Amino acid sequence: MFAEIITIGDELLIGQVTDTNSTWMGRELNKVGIEVIRVVSVRDRADEIIEAVDASMKRADIVLVTGGLGPTKDDITKQTLCKYFGTRLIFSEAVFENVKRVLAGKIPMNALNKSQAMVPEDCIVINNRVGSASVSWFEKDGKVLVSMPGVPQEMTTVMSEEVIPRLCAKFRTDAIVHRTFTVQNYPESVLAEKLESWEMALPACLKLAYLPKPGLIRLRLTGRGQNRSEVEACVNTESAKLEAILGEDILDEEDTPIEILIGELLKKKNLTLSTAESCTGGSIAARITSVAGSSEYFKGSIVAYANEVKTELLGVSMETLEKRGAVSEETVIEMVKGAMKALKTDCAVATSGIAGPSGGTEEKPVGTVWIAAAYKSEICTMKQETNRGREMNVERASNNALLLLRKLVK
């Protein structure tokens, strides 16, 4: 069963608003066996909306439209869909009651808000309990188009409570089963080469996808078929083969973020952690503290961007900085020791590098980052030398620091 998503709004195309709706819909539809094959964004222009709708209705079984249902003049989705389906707008007392309920005590009722009760005559109107814009369900030639509000909270509510259950009742869908493995220590091309024979022999019902992240690769194995038990058995069989090939290079089998894995490991071993960060600017600490309950094992961070902070708060010697430089193995070793001492922790990570876009030299180009991880008296280091732009360099360094710590503590 195939679906297409059409998001409507000039704000999406000029980058003023990020389309999170499509990501959420794709994930939730996939859970019930509906595969999204295309996502299209169009402006608030009637001819462009009609063109997109017509193309999607020809290709897909289900078309999901979001946006353009507000009360202002630039919200033209309802009128445009009426034109496409050859119907007209009529006033709905039931929808008007819902509009009054939603707006009560918040916004005065005026003609624009009352216009929210105008709905297409030839459609199933679905109530929106958290907003004033109703949902329109159209059927044509065995296919379904659903028009929903673009406000994420409203869309997710009506999709979860109304649209997805109705789609499941109307259409027979395949079972889709995913297993995602997070793999470390491999460039994508090297990993693909290692898995080539296994991948070539996969059954037709299975598909493998490579999803690179800075310092990591996620392998998503997807099985699809009418019998869920058979699909799950097939996925499990091939997953076992993959595990035998990659062994300890598999970091996780549930696509769990590394910061959560680190937290679980530290809690299990009753250890405490601190960070000393230069080029990563506190991003490692931010990731660690994004996990609920991290106060059980994380004590704090020293963001030592300037050399004087490295010396005064972390105890890095001026001699090391002058002879080896801030971006050096010796410096991060002293930083990680200083963090453990200052914050009295069992383990720590430290980073110092050149994130870019400027500041590099021939000896130490942009993207050079030294990373250290310490666990009690043990210290290990690594040098990162890949330049993928400032943001990516920082993210990669953060990942590598946490991976290095996990390897040391595990």
UniProtKB/Swiss-Prot annotation:
Signal peptide: none annotated. It comes from the Bacteria. SUPFAM superfamilies: CinA-like, Molybdenum cofactor biosynthesis proteins. HAMAP family: CinA_B. Belongs to the CinA family. NCBIfam families: cinA_nterm, molyb_syn, PncC_domain. This is CinA-like protein. It comes from Bacteroides fragilis (strain ATCC 25285 / DSM 2151 / CCUG 4856 / JCM 11019 / LMG 10263 / NCTC 9343 / Onslow / VPI 2553 / EN-2).
